[in-house]
């Protein structure tokens, strides 16, 4: 039987089946003759054992019908004899050499073939099916090929050869352990399919850890030998990368064990209380993300997600191992621009500034402080200047008409009249004109009503109005002029000395109207000194009557130009705040003291 399996023929062919029947002690209907060169077949017993249909009462065979798998598709003995004749068997006359008595009462048939002999299964290769085509080939001297065995048949052939011959390996045997046995259970997951066509064994085995106890018995491959040469497995591993597993040292043949590759991905997810500390730098993040082996997740990991940008800019000392947000200290945010808020979990970067963020001094704050100091300095200098007082404008007999073509220029400085009265009036009013514009440029610069009550002093009197469009109303202007005359008379009673006069006109352009009963001037608004929507002042400087006004005009503009340059270095963003600060620090006398 085992000798037949080692023969490279198809086990499903008729010669192979006939060989197994003759050599099986189970069947008595077919056996060798006395010389071992022919077959003796008892027809009635053969039909009962092998040709009857499977079943408990089929044919009354003594061997038990249906015990052996079906060997022949036919149930006729004549068909079986036809198959013998087709493969070259010839019937021998009874009583000839090697004949014998039948085992039963029926007829006994004797067949002979020179390629079918006892203990010589290798001769079965020469048994050909003598069809018409094969006969023609044999007559022509051509070789008739036989059907080769399939993969399963080759596996059985290899198992048979392994059972008869000892294993010869190029690798050294295991150092300790008994002789390997051909049978034994094989762990689950050990077999790895190999697609090497030139390999005799279609399977290569990969061992599993020794603690895996789920096994199943090996049935079909229990006699599969390991080839005598070392082959390369399906993963492309060489003999130097395999080792003999001690797990299977006593389980038949030594199985090769695959070593770990550097590119092998192993996921071992287990809970651990140790924290994973994130290091600073993008290279560290990339290198750590590529290491999948033995990754231990942190048990303290929160639901917040920290992008790579945050991990790059935050130092490890201010980060609690992916468990809480970054400590809001000024040192940790020195180079951090964006921060992912863990409570919001938004997909866009959120700018985060801690509560104790140091407020840096900006240029705007510096300008504010400088402007405040400049205001106080100018106020102190104005305290020591000569007293300014509002006086009544003396009426003149001559009129001073001004052409509308001089719009946007000073009404007194641009007078081209050669009248001595107008010339003297222009010489008296021109020098002090820049004073009013300079003071207004840094004290009042708003288009809304000033809420703070300005303190009054004997030196300053402010007349502040909300910039509103002025219509052609003679009644309103006359009422305002009358109030101004009343105030001028009161101040003349206290200060009867002569003084110089500065007249600054405010408001948007308005048509010609009568200012006073004694003074008639056709004027237009000044655009080069003040905007049309700002306030105006009526300021006069009190001085000795003997001192000429031209000398005063030479010194005053120079002094206030310096004040204007200092005040215009930086404009205050909030003029109301400056006035409030000046009021609170009591730089000026209170209004009650002024009235007294």
From Swiss-Prot:
Keyword annotations from UniProtKB, A to Z: Activator, Chromosome, Differentiation, DNA-binding, Meiosis, Nucleus, Phosphoprotein, Repressor, Spermatogenesis, Transcription, Transcription regulation
GO cellular component: nucleus; XY body
Protein purpose: DNA-binding transcription factor that is essential for male fertility, spermatogenesis and meiotic prophase progression in spermatocytes under non-stress conditions. Positvely and negatively regulates gene expression to ensure progression of meiotic prophase beyond pachytene stage in spermatocytes. Plays a role in male germline meiotic sex chromosome remodeling and silencing through regulation of SMARCA4.
Gene Ontology molecular functions: DNA-binding transcription activator activity; DNA-binding transcription repressor activity; sequence-specific double-stranded DNA binding
Protein name in UniProt: Heat shock factor protein 5
Biological process terms in GO annotation: cell differentiation; male meiotic nuclear division; spermatogenesis
Pfam families linked: HSF_DNA-bind (PF00447)
Modified sites of kind Phosphoserine: 572
UniProt xrefs under SMART domains: HSF
Statement: the UniProt record of this protein carries the keyword RNA-binding: no
Region of interest (Disordered), residue spans: 541-576
Description of how the protein assembles with itself and partners: Homooligomer.
Family per similarity comment: Belongs to the HSF family.
Compartment list: Nucleus; Chromosome
Main location class: nucleus
């Amino acid at each position: 039987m085992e000798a037949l399996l080692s023969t490279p023929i198809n086990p499903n062919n008729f010669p192979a089946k006939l060989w197994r029947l003759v050599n099986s002690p189970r069947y008595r209907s077919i056996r060798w003759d006395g010389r071992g060169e022919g077959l003796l077949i008892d027809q009635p017993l053969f039909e009962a054992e092998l040709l009857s249909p499977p079943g408990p009462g089929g044919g009354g065979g003594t061997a038990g019908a249906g015990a052996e798998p079906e060997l022949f598709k036919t149930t006729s003995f004549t068909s079986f004899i036809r198959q013998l004749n087709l493969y070259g068997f010839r019937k021998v006359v009874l009583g000839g050499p090697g004949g014998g008595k039948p085992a039963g009462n029926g007829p006994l048939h004797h067949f002979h073939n020179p390629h079918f002999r006892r203990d010589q299964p290798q001769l079965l290769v020469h048994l050909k099916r003598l069809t018409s085509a094969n006969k023609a080939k044999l007559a022509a001297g051509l070789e008739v090929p036989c059907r080769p065995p399939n993969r399963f048949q080759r596996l059985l052939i290899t198992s048979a050869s392994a059972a008869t011959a000892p294993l010869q390996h190029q690798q050294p045997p295991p150092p300790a352990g008994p002789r390997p046995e051909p049978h034994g259970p094989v762990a689950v997951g050990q077999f790895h399919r190999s697609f090497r066509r030139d390999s005799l064994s279609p399977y290569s085995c990969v061992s599993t850890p020794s603690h895996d106890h789920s096994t199943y018995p090996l049935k079909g491959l229990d006699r599969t030998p390991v080839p005598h040469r070392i082959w390369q497995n399906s993963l492309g591993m060489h003999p130097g990368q395999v080792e003999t597993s001690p797990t299977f040292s006593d389980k038949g043949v030594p199985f090769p064990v695959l070593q770990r590759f550097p590119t092998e991905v192993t996921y071992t997810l287990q809970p651990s209380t140790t924290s994973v500390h994130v290091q600073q730098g993008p290279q560290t993040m990339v290198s750590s993300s590529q290491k999948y082996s033995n990754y231990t997740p942190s048990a303290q990991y929160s639901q917040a997600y920290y992008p790579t940008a945050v991990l790059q800019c935050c130092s490890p000392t201010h980060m609690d191992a992916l468990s809480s947000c970054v400590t809001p200290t000024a040192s940790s945010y020195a180079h951090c621009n964006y921060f992912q808020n863990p409570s919001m979990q938004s997909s866009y970067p959120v700018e985060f500034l801690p509560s104790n963020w140091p407020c840096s001094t900006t240029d705007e704050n510096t300008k504010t402080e400088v402007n405040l100091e400049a205001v106080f300095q100018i106020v102190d200098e104005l305290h020591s200047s000569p007293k300014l007082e509002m006086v009544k404008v003396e009426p003149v007999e001559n009129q001073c008409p001004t052409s509308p073509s001089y719009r946007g220029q000073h009404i007194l400085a641009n007078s081209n009249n050669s009248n001595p009265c107008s010339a003297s009036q222009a010489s008296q009013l021109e020098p002090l004109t820049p004073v009013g514009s300079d003071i207004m440029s840094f004290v009042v610069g708003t288009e809304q009503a000033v809420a703070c009550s300005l303190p009054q002093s004997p030196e300053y009197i402010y007349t502040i109005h909300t910039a509103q469009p002025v219509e052609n109303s003679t009644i309103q202007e006359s009422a305002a002029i009358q109030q101004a005359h009343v105030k001028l008379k009161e101040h003349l009673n206290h200060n009867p000395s002569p003084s110089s006069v500065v007249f600054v006109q405010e408001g948007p352009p308005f048509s010609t109207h009568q200012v006073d009963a004694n003074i008639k001037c056709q004027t237009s608004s000044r655009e080069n000194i003040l905007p049309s929507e700002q306030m105006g002042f009526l300021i006069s400087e009190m001085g000795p009557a003997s001192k000429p006004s031209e000398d005063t005009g030479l010194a005053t503009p120079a002094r206030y130009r310096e004040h204007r340059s200092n005040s215009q270095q930086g404009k205050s963003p909030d003029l109301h705040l400056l006035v409030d600060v000046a009021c609170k620090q009591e730089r000026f006398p209170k209004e009650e003291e002024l009235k007294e």
